[in-house]
Amino acid sequence: MTELAKRYGGSLYELAAEENLTVELLQQLRTAVNSIEAEPQYLRLLSTPSVPKKERCALLDKAFEGAHPYLVSFLKLLCEEDLLGELPGCLRAYQDRYNVDHNILEVTAVSAIALTAPNREKLLAKLQKMTGKNIVLTETVDPAVLGGLRLDMDGTRLDGTVQRHLERLRTEIDGAVL
């Protein structure tokens, strides 16, 4: 995420917080990012210098007609400044600020097989106790980890996978003097 994305996304969050619209604008911002990412040609059109900015902004007005005026104005501002490519970073910055204000920690759990419901509940309870935060868990299945669990959260990786243990063992064996 660039500094520009942090600044713009953070500013939108501050405005939303002042107006008590953080949840609504977060959902609409996600929808906007997903829509624009799903249609890369649309982003190219909105970024084309040969199309006057006024017309590009009119396209945004039409595409996001039902969205909150703050979001539409935000998108138009990015368009006018030729910064629509920063929109995913703006969403990340907004989400980060939202998470801090709402004591939320996003965690990605990677395992060889899907977690069972009881294991998921135990993991959530342990993470909540360990961090004191509300956990939003994203699960990913990757057979390459062979077994165990890898957790990525807030820039920290806790790796208890069989794959990692084998890598560590391989490194120790390679470093051993024979």
Model-predicted regions and their roles:
Residues 1-178:
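Elongated, mostly alpha-helical coiled-coil "stalk/stator" tethers of large membrane protein machines
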